[in-house]
A protein has these predicted regions:
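Catalytic-domain carbohydrate-binding cleft regions of carbohydrate-active enzymes
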Residues: 1-345, 350-351, 530, 534-545
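Solvent-exposed loop and beta-edge segments used for protein-protein assembly and interaction
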Residues: 31-35, 291, 307, 366-368, ...
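Accessory, solvent-exposed terminal regions and/or long lumenal/extracellular loops of proteins
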Residues: 352-450, 477-545
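Hydrophobic residues embedded in beta-strands of well-ordered beta-sheets
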Residues: 295-296, 412-416, 461
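Surface-exposed loop/edge segments in extracytoplasmic proteins
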Residues: 323, 329-332, 444-453
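A surface-exposed beta-strand-loop module
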Residues: 455-473
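Ordered hydrophobic segments in well-structured contexts
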Residues: 153-155, 290, 296-298, 338-340, ...
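Residues that cap or initiate secondary-structure elements
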Residues: 47, 146, 278-280, 303, ...
């Protein structure tokens, strides 16, 4: 009956728009495109094309079925007629209307009408090739179809429950997938269904998502499970907004890392033991991973401790000096450590000399940034920024910009060179402006071979200069480093935030009162009977510069 047909069309599987919800879906898609938003639609092809679909008549005729019979057009891997109709009659018209790529959500097993062929792998293959038409870089979103699926990015890890256990698993899952060459996982950030409402859990999930291959907020169809930041308490909303904006700023860094992955097979997220296979500690931190060439991330997946108002992440610091890009704390490895952070922070550590390109453009465009900022950390390093035209011929139409960073600690002198871009510089937006922020420098004498202005960014020295087709050379002397709180002040601040009876806190603090140096404070800490969570917090404060 007509009524039952409408009911089926409103169900889970189908290829026709619900016109009660989208009265003019073409205008809706056009509006999204005008907002610089890309569109993907969720597919469940297992039931084929049924008689109540808008395009059924055309599909049925194409495969030799009389539409009057209302016979289902069954999904088939071996029928050329089916594949041609599937793309030409079902998907391509919607692509002309504004759909950019497809989310392939096959969940009906690995058997098809071709023995040994997983239908999801076949769908991935054909959709990926089809999406490359007209010069586009091909993209799909899909469930995992087994080994070899890494050829068809990107991945969808499935419907997850909303709880801390699932969040705790995902950083390990994401980094560990590098062992199967599956680098581009995406998760339902915030969780998909079931579980419980927890604003803290939501924000921690977003923080992890910012430092994962793909950030994709999603939930099941439930009015009470929306993942929009404004549906959470105000402090969480403001922090989520900050993190989502920062993720967009990372577009230049992540794009460069994804190009390196394409060329060299180096994953954006990789386990610590990839670089340190002989270090036992590198195998004992499953939730810590390299995020590109410059950063290490250790997402916090545990609940906030009510005594410290902080949550923790287990981490291992490799040999060398690593600086938290947000708190500027310096960690000297190798060492095992428990990292403590407030709800609004995630531990992300930069290697010595790290160079991190960030977009300074307003809005949500995915184009190469017109305003580009470089975060510079003290040390010796080089970094090559990659940009292209976003088309399949990108190997011919790309530009690379090399940045050299040298730091002479003894003379307190920094030299930074932004080399002249090489390649197809037409992909670089005209009128580009650079902002170079030395994250650990408060002030310095600046020498530059171009006109420039000096500004301060969160107390750090920033230099602004126009793009140049020649080398830009910056030299800093008489450097004044940003001063961190002294160690006694750190002890006082940490113990002040301790949620405990004043008399008890005062008694524990008494032995620290007469200690002045870091060594004296650490000695008191070692013999103190403080609760473990407070000792961990104080230890981190005392061993970092």
């Amino acid at each position: 009956s007509a009524a039952s047909d409408v009911y089926k069309r409103q169900g889970w599987t189908g290829y026709s728009w619900n016109t009660e919800l989208f009265k003019d879906y073409k205008s809706f898609l056009n509006n999204l495109q005008n907002r610089n938003l890309k569109v993907t639609l969720n597919l469940h092809p297992a039931d084929g094309i049924r008689h109540f679909e808008d395009m059924y008549n055309d599909v049925a005729k194409a495969v030799g079925i009389d539409p009057e019979t209302k016979e289902d057009v069954k999904f088939s891997c071996k029928s050329d007629d089916f594949w041609n109709a599937y793309f030409d009659k079902v998907h391509k018209p919607y692509e002309k209307d504004g759909v950019d790529f497809w989310w392939i959500d096959w969940q009906q097993g690995k058997k098809s009408d071709i023995e040994g062929l997983d239908p999801l792998l076949a769908l991935n293959h054909y959709h990926f090739l089809d999406n490359a038409e007209n010069g586009k870089l091909p993209l799909i979103l899909s469930r995992y179809a087994g080994l070899g699926s890494h050829r068809y990015p990107l991945g969808f890890s499935g419907d997850t429950a909303i709880n801390h256990k699932v969040l705790d698993f995902q950083p390990y899952f994401t980094a560990n997938a590098a062992n199967a060459a599956y680098f581009w996982w995406s998760h339902d950030i915030g969780g998909h269904h079931f579980g419980y409402k927890d604003d803290e859990l939501y924000l921690r999930w977003i923080e992890f998502g910012v430092f994962s291959p793909i950030l994709r907020l999603h939930s099941t169809s439930n009015d009470l499970l929306g993942k929009e930041p404004w549906k959470y308490r105000r402090d969480v909303y403001l922090s989520a907004k900050k993190w989502l904006n920062f993720r967009h700023r990372l577009i230049a860094y992540i794009f460069t890392m994804d190009y390196k992955c394409h060329k060299n097979g180096t994953p954006l997220c990789k386990p610590m033991y990839y670089a340190y296979p002989n270090e036992e500690s590198a195998f004992n931190v499953p939730n810590e991973y390299f995020f590109g060439s410059e950063l290490i991330a250790a997402p916090i997946t545990s609940k906030t401790n009510k005594k410290t108002n902080m949550a923790t992440a287990k981490a291992w610091i490799p040999k060398g000096t690593y600086t938290d890009i947000f708190t500027l704390q310096k960690y000297h490895g190798p060492m095992d450590i428990t990292l403590n952070r407030e709800l609004y922070d995630i531990p992300v550590l930069a290697k010595e000399g790290a160079i991190i390109p960030l977009s300074n453009d307003d809005g949500n465009s995915s184009a190469n940034p017109k305003a580009l900022e470089f975060w510079i950390f003290n040390g010796n390093n080089s970094f090559t920024l990659y940009e292209d035209n976003g088309r399949v011929n990108f190997e011919k139409h790309n530009a690379k910009t090399k940045i050299l960073n040298t730091f002479d600690e003894k003379s307190r002198k920094i030299k930074l060179t932004i080399k002249a871009p090489f390649g197809d510089c037409e992909v670089i937006p005209s009128g580009r402006k650079y902002k170079i922020t030395f994250k650990e420098i408060e002030s310095a004498d600046v020498k530059l071979n171009k006109e420039f202005t000096i500004s301060n960014s969160d107390s750090a020295l920033s230099i602004e200069v126009d793009f140049s087709s020649d080398d830009i050379e910056i030299e800093l002397t008489n450097i004044k480093l940003i001063k961190m709180p002294d160690y006694k002040e750190r002890v006082i601040n940490s113990m002040s935030r301790w949620q405990e009876q004043t008399s008890k806190k005062t008694a524990y603090y008494k032995p620290f009162k007469n200690a002045q140096t870091r060594e004296e404070l650490l000695k008191v800490l070692r013999i103190s009977k403080l609760p473990k969570e407070i000792k961990n917090l104080l230890y981190e404060q005392l061993i970092t510069d």
